[in-house]
Design a protein with these regions (language model features):
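A short, charged
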Residues: 82, 86, 90-98, 151-172, ...
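Short histidine-centered catalytic/ligand-binding loop motif
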Residues: 70-79, 127-139
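Rossmann-like S-adenosyl-L-methionine
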Residues: 179-404
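Non-catalytic substrate-recognition/targeting regions of SAM-dependent transferases
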Residues: 107-120, 139-210, 219
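Non-catalytic accessory regions of SAM-dependent methyltransferases
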Residues: 1-123
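Short, surface-exposed beta-strand-loop junctions and turns on beta-sheet-rich folds
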Residues: 65, 134-136, 206-207
Length: 404
């Protein structure tokens, strides 16, 4: 496609379709569409009309995807380089107002009205994840705009790495891509977050290298960890464990099934001078927790930060079983009056269902939960109301007490 900004045709909705869209949603699904004009090009821009031919907006189209249209604008008018640059400016300006920008998510797809692209900043390195065909064609333009805008804020970028290697790209008819955008650089980046130093592996780490969405949740557990014996399950590269360590925990055990992650976590502990307090074990959490219970272990604080147990509605029942089991096991290991931090990062595990599942786990082990905090993802992962896909992280902190 020679002209990125060309409107390639019109997509028309079925009669009565598009209710979610009309209430603020950002996606149009394949089963909501009536017709495509002959000129429509997959990956291109289109006008979206309702069944009565009323203009509803401009978006990217991809007939190979169940999410067939991703909305870019609700207004008539030209989409051009300045339009895209303003979206990027708005995204950066929002982060400057709301979060520590030394390391943060700068662009969060639909929630920043740039559907299908995620860009994280780790110190002076950008990591790009493109998940949709339409926005993929704007990727270089967005990166160039971002570098220019950050430089104006006094934050020059030394390198950009692409981690568009998620399986979801195949649903868009795209290959999984990974590599440098521009000049090569050392992909092991050191950052500081909440006073904790980390090495972030942007090339081979999970997702883009570090889960920035938990930034302030990691800090929130600190006050409970002073002098405490702490268990951090699904520790990844040790972020919750290290926050517990610098907050004065007496001992911390971090557990993860990935040997690569555990090795990185151990290195991060040494980087912070915490290797005598924070130690890590490579093990399956579902296997280890019953073993710890059998041996009579108890902890002042237990942290559960599992991966998404479901990425579709079809597997939600199995996910509920997984979350119930892990919370049940975790509660059994908390001392009477101790604390549990537990979360779900699956969009399909909605807040109501997650809350219900935790409650069932507590009843099964005869524990009472005293809620201290309920939190979501950090503000650099904004939750756009009516765009349900932007809310995915649920995070509780409880005091766990025996039934009285």
């Amino acid at each position: 496609m020679t002209n990125l900004f060309k409107i390639t045709g019109t997509v028309t909705l079925k009669k009565g379709a598009g209710r979610q869209l009309k209430s603020g949603g950002m996606w149009v699904y394949d089963n909501e569409i009536d017709t495509f004009s002959e000129t429509v090009e997959d990956g291109g821009l289109i006008e979206l009309h309702d069944f009565d031919d009323y203009f509803m907006g401009i978006g990217f189209v991809n007939r190979r995807s169940k999410i067939t249209v991703r909305m870019l604008s609700r207004h008539e008018g030209e989409i051009n380089e300045e339009f895209i640059k303003q979206r990027v400016k708005d995204a950066v300006s929002y982060r400057m107002d709301t979060v520590d920008t030394s390391s943060c998510r700068l662009i969060f797809g639909e929630a920043d009205f740039l559907p299908g692209i995620v860009i994280d900043k780790f110190s002076d390195v950008l990591v790009v994840e493109s998940l949709a065909l339409g926005i993929d064609r704007f990727k270089q333009l967005i990166v160039d705009d971002l570098k220019e805008i950050l430089k104006e804020y006094g934050m020059p970028i030394r390198g950009v790495y692409e981690r568009s290697d998620a399986k979801v790209r195949q649903l868009e008819g795209m290959e999984r891509v990974k590599g440098f955008i521009g000049e090569e650089f050392d992909t092991k980046v050191m950052i500081t977050e909440n006073g904790v130093k980390y090495y972030v592996d942007v090339k081979d780490g999970q997702k883009t290298g570090l889960f920035l969405d938990q930034k302030y949740n990691r800090r929130a557990i600190g006050g409970l960890c002073k002098g405490a014996k702490v268990l951090d399950c699904f520790t990844h590269t040790g972020s919750f464990a290290l926050n517990a360590g610098i907050s004065g925990a007496s001992s911390v055990l971090g557990v993860d099934a990935s040997e690569l992650a555990v090795n990185q976590a151990t290195e991060n502990a040494k980087l912070n001078g915490l290797e005598d307090i924070v130690r890590f074990k490579c093990a399956d959490v579902f296997d280890l927790l019953p073993q710890l219970e059998k041996s009579g272990e108890k902890f002042d604080v237990v942290i559960l930060d599992p991966p998404a147990f479901t990425k579709s509605r079809n597997s939600i029942k199995n996910a509920v079983k997984g979350y119930r089991e892990i919370n049940l096991r975790g509660m059994k290991l908390v001392k009477d009056g101790g604390y549990l931090a537990t979360c779900s990062c699956s969009h399909f595990m909605d807040p109501e269902l997650f809350t219900k599942t935790i409650g069932e786990a507590a009843r099964n082990v005869h524990k009472r939960l005293r809620q201290i905090e309920y939190r979501t993802q950090s503000p650099d992962h904004p939750i756009l109301w009516s765009a349900d896909e932007s809310l995915y992280l649920k995070f509780y902190i409880f005091q766990v007490v025996d039934e009285k």
